[in-house]
Structure formats: structure tokens, C-alpha cells
Swiss-Prot record:
It comes from Pyrobaculum aerophilum (strain ATCC 51768 / DSM 7523 / JCM 9630 / CIP 104966 / NBRC 100827 / IM2). The lineage of its organism: Archaea, Thermoproteota, Thermoprotei, Thermoproteales, Thermoproteaceae. Gene3D superfamilies: Glutamine Phosphoribosylpyrophosphate, subunit 1, domain 1 (3.60.20.10). Component of the proteasome core, a large protease complex with broad specificity involved in protein degradation. One of its GO terms (cellular component) is cytosol. This is Proteasome subunit beta 2. The keyword 4Fe-4S does not apply. InterPro entries: Ntn_hydrolases_N (IPR029055), Pept_T1A_Psome_bsu_arc (IPR019983), Pept_T1A_subB (IPR000243), Proteasome_bsu_CS (IPR016050), Proteasome_sua/b (IPR001353), Proteasome_suB-type (IPR023333). Belongs to the peptidase T1B family. The active site is at T10. Its EC number is 3.4.25.1.
């Protein structure tokens, strides 16, 4: 019989009053073997949208590429950026269409549009849930405990960045398949950008 192998990853998202913060740790693991400590699980789609994911790296990269291509095509045709919800619904349809051979990825979609900031949580089958904060992956239970304690409805982007890092550090310290450092994507009125936070590994 085949041995079950756990694919590790932890990602968090926080909706702030002035934007959205997404973050994920960088370790790529196969079971308890670390393949890399420089995996990218946070992707800027355009200057109003980003995603973070937990799951298999190849599936994350494929979904990010699909979203980038469709966001660009929409902008070229419609002469405006797609809304956060329209891109999330597109991703939902794509993921649900693969329900019999699903993408092994949970996704956080974060964006800002005319309606304000949005954080949308998606499972591998494309279910859509909008929330104020969320955590995905093997370290989600550890990370969400920090988010539960630290989140406020009036939290700012800068405060959300610090809270996201704290949540992921909690996961990295206790989840053996999370680690390597932290990537962040920040989406606010100034656009979307990525940042990196180095974390000392606990071995």
C-alpha cells in the first residue's frame, strides 16, 4: 500500500480598513523532507489583486498564471481592472471544473476595488467565503489562534502585516512542515507589492 505523504504549507490573509495583507511561509516539503526553503506561495496578480496559497507548488503556480492571464485579458478588453469578486468567481469555476481531478491548493484571494478591500477564502473545489481574516494549510490551527486574538475591524495595513508575521511565526515554530521565511503581499491604494521577512529556523 502507498504511504500517505503530507504536503506542508501555511498561508494567512487579513482584511484591513485600508487594504489587504496576504502572507505565506516559504518551506517546500514532501512529508517531513524539506525540498526547499525558498518556495513562493504568494503571487501578485495585478496592481489591485494578489493571492496566497497552501498546497502543491505546481498547482499554486498554475492557478496564479491562469489568473494573471485572465486579469490582463479583461483589462485589455474592458479598459479597466477586474473586480476582486469577478476574479475570485473565475477561479472558483476553474477549480470546480477540475473537481474530479482537483488542484491540490487552498487559496486566499485579496484585493481592493471600488467597493473597498476584500479577502476571499477558497477550498480546492472552489467554494467561496468572504471573511475578515483566515488561515490555510497544515499550520492553520496555530496561525488562526493568533489572528483570533489580534484582529480588530479597524486594523490598518501596517498592523495587519505585523499580525500576519506573528501568526506565521507561531505556525513555523510548531508545525514541522512549515518554515523557511515569510513572503507577504500587500494590496492597498498604492497598488500591490511583495515583501519578504526572514525568520530564523528552529531545528
Amino acid at each position: 500500500m502507498g504511504e500517505e505523504v503530507q504536503i506542508g504549507a501555511t498561508a494567512v490573509g487579513i482584511k484591513a480598513k485600508d487594504g489587504v495583507v496576504l502572507a505565506a511561509e516559504k518551506r517546500v516539503s514532501y512529508g517531513f523532507y524539506t525540498l526547499s526553503s525558498a518556495g513562493k506561495k504568494v503571487f501578485v496578480i495585478d496592481d489591485k489583486l494578489a493571492i496566497a496559497s497552501a498546497g502543491i507548488i505546481a498547482d499554486m503556480q498554475t492557478l496564479a498564471k491562469i489568473l494573471k492571464l485572465n486579469a490582463k485579458a479583461y483589462e485589455l478588453e474592458m479598459k479597466r481592472k477586474p473586480s476582486t469578486h469577478s476574479m475570485a468567481r473565475l477561479l472558483s469555476v476553474i477549480m470546480f471544473s477540475r473537481r474530479f481531478m482537483p488542484f491540490f491548493a487552498e487559496v486566499l484571494v485579496g484585493g481592493i476595488d471600488e467597493e473597498g478591500p476584500h479577502l476571499i477564502v477558497m477550498d480546492p473545489l472552489g467554494s467561496l467565503i468572504e471573511d475578515n481574516y483566515a488561515a490555510l494549510g497544515t499550520g492553520a490551527k496555530l496561525a488562526v489562534a493568533v489572528l483570533d486574538t489580534g484582529y480588530r475591524p479597524d486594523i490598518t495595513v501596517e498592523e495587519a502585516k505585523k499580525l500576519a508575521v506573528q501568526a506565521l511565526k507561531a505556525a513555523i515554530e510548531r508545525d514541522p512542515v512549515s518554515g523557511g521565511g515569510i513572503d507577504l503581499a500587500i494590496v492597498d491604494k498604492n497598488g500591490a507589492r511583495e515583501e519578504e521577512v526572514r525568520v530564523q529556523l528552529l531545528i
